[in-house]
Amino acid sequence: PINPWAVAQQQFDLAAERLNLDPAMRRVLREPRRELTVHFPVKMDDGSVKVYTGYRVQHNLGRGPAKGGIRYHQDVSLDEVKALAMWMTWKCAVVGIPYGGGKGGVIVDPKKLSMKELEALSRRFFTEIEILVGPEKDIPPPDVNTNAQVMSWFMDTYSMHAGHTVPGVVTGKPISLGGSEGRNEATARGTLFCVREACAVLKKPVRGATVAVQGYGNAGAIAARLL
């Protein structure tokens, strides 16, 4: 299997070479600034206790607080999270927004959990990574198998520990909790804009074109509809 972290570092090396990047800066930007691995217990509905493993990685904070989602999937790995955090640094820099790159995840198949178990896992995981997150430090949004409901649990957990409501600790919240309208379609709409601009550069007509979409989740399904 392809190691995503090895791929990300290869991409970085190619870009750094082309940019003639200072050797010291290469060493700094080639590795994540922080990697946190947590193992935490969750009480299941049948009374048993399972221990789950989760990660939060901050690749670079030079431009501002880390930005990058938290995913729930049985194939989550530290190398995957590190690569995604590095790519988030690049994405935020390319579009010129004042954020760094981060990413997180838990090794779990959420489809096998009840709503009560999912809430318990979400609240405990966010408690474990709380030392890294915050409105001025690291602001997670949803990702694979996480949504506005999970973000509301994250926000509520952080707010309880802070002693006051902190809506800015996550994005992708429900509208009723200060979320943004259009957030659900944002990733797919960004894809639409990128496709449109790429077609303009390549001088290819968008109307009548055939498009292949990989994946049919929140991004792929909505992108297919918009395209």
Model-derived features: where do they sit?
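N-terminal Rossmann-fold NAD(P) dinucleotide-binding loop
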Residues: G220-A221
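Glycine/serine-rich phosphate-binding loop and adjoining beta1-alpha1 elements at the start
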Residues: H73, C92-R207
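Charged catalytic carboxylate motif
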Residues: Q11, E80, G190
